[in-house]
């Protein structure tokens, strides 16, 4: 509740806390970097005016060396954080563009469904092709036959609304 809207936007899209410390990419700011100013403003307004304030100290971050060195996140961000908006795709429909924005930005689907590299960066060339997330497997959600390519629009809508699709999928883990 003590963040200004600018500080909130920087945390959300750049991974920088109000005190200037770097966030770890467990906070999916790499995906949120694609969010529009209007959506960031709407989130800020909701959190500040629509969610009751709770005094709760965050537990200390406990990571092994060298991941526990927050200053290293500056280098990680220089290598892997793209602060540019999603590239234009003038040949695509408004529905496709909105879907890309939701999947790659606000909903951050790739955060779990994209394999990670040695430095825990998303392997963009394998975007949304499925990945291990702790004890869970986030499956391939590309249009490939091994993903959701054979699903109908109705099935996809049902799954996103309910988290299950009889005979095909059941949401689990952090989904």
List each language-model region with its residue ranges.
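Hydrophobic or amphipathic alpha-helical targeting/insertion segments
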Residues: 40-47
